[in-house]
Regions:
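A short catalytic or substrate-binding loop motif that flags glycine-/basic-rich loops and adjacent residues
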Residues: 90-92, 105-110, 244
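ATPase catalytic-site recognition across NTP-hydrolyzing enzymes
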Residues: 27-102
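Acidic two-metal-ion nuclease catalytic site recognized across multiple nuclease folds
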Residues: 254-280
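Well-ordered alpha-helical segments embedded in enzymatic catalytic cores
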Residues: 113, 146-150, 249
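Short, glycine/acidic-enriched loop or turn micro-motifs at the edges of active sites
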Residues: 102-104, 169
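Mg2+-dependent endonuclease catalytic cores in nucleic-acid-processing enzymes, primarily RNase H-like
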Residues: 2-31, 39-43, 60, 64, ...
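Acidic, metal-ligating active-site segments
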Residues: 108-120
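Conserved RecA-like P-loop NTPase helicase motor core
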Residues: 222, 245-249
Length: 280
């Protein structure tokens, strides 16, 4: 044997002890106050969410299958986006994304969901402003074109010209169909192709849970009339229960995208009062 002459009499690391020092001790004091103050620790918790903070900073790992998405953590609002001031209520919007996670849209299949999302990157708040669930009659001969027309109507009413489309599986040819439908309308749009490689459950959990657990996920009240809240209640990382999660997947995809910068309409335009008190 190769290691016969170098055999160890005792197993490697026999009798070792694990040293665990969480960033905050049992009394709530920082373990290293000169590096991590109370304010800095609170900021970290707000950024990564309670689950990741517990695992990485408190050394208390939470099994992913125990994770859930509680709709009680959502913060609802009624205000519409004010493009002139680039605001939703008191919040200044810095970016937006329109994201489409497509499917056939037929009954007994995955839902096709399109999400409009705004962001306030100063406060790290995310606003799910609208979720469009697309359905197609079983008799429809061209289900993808039918959905493209509905999405284009959605974009036109909100004065949007850019959309990100997930191209995994059925969506691989959808950007071309979307451009063709827009061309026939005379609409000028930009389509961004998105290919996801991570599992759906990881995408949903890692994108939504940190925002939800820290009170940074805002949802327009109209979305209470969609299947989204039922999706949250029935969702499990293991997929147990067979509940649809297509709206959640679309929101996760939108959160992961680089937002399009948003600026107030007419920003930089100043008014001047002319001095007309002169004689010729």
């Amino acid at each position: 044997m190769v290691y016969e002459k170098n055999a160890f009499s005792t197993p490697f690391l026999s009798g070792y002890k694990v040293l665990k020092i969480p960033i905050v001790n049992a009394c709530g004091d920082p373990a290293w106050p000169e590096l991590f103050s109370h304010a800095r620790i609170a900021q970290m918790r707000e950024t990564v969410g309670h689950r990741h903070f517990s695992a990485q900073m408190m050394l208390n790992f939470v099994q992913p299958e125990r994770a859930h998405l509680d709709p009680a953590g959502l913060r609802f609002y009624d205000e519409e986006f004010d493009a002139h001031r680039s605001k939703i209520g008191p919040h200044t919007i810095t970016g937006m994304i329109l994201y489409w996670d497509p499917s056939s849209g037929r009954r007994r299949h995955d839902a096709s969901a399109c999400v409009l999302l705004y962001r306030d990157d100063r406060t790290k708040y995310v606003f799910v402003h609208d979720v469009l669930y697309l359905t197609v009659p079983d008799t429809e001969k061209y289900p993808l074109s039918h959905q493209c027309e509905s999405v284009l109507d959605f974009m036109r009413t909100r004065n949007l010209y850019r959309i990100s489309i997930e191209v995994n599986g059925l969506g691989i040819g959808l950007p071309e169909i979307m451009r063709d439908c827009a061309l026939r309308r005379g609409a000028n749009i930009f389509v961004n192709r998105v290919k996801n490689t991570k599992s759906k459950s990881d995408r949903i959990l890692n994108a939504i849970e940190p925002l939800l657990s820290t009170g940074r996920l805002y949802v327009h009240s109209r979305i209470q009339n969609t299947p989204l809240l039922a999706e949250m209640l029935g969702w499990s990382p293991t997929g147990v229960g067979g509940m649809h999660d297509d709206g959640l997947d679309a929101i996760a995809g939108a959160i992961a995208q680089t937002p399009i910068p948003v600026h107030p309409i007419g920003s930089g335009v100043k008014t001047y009062a002319a001095n007309t008190n002169f004689s010729v």
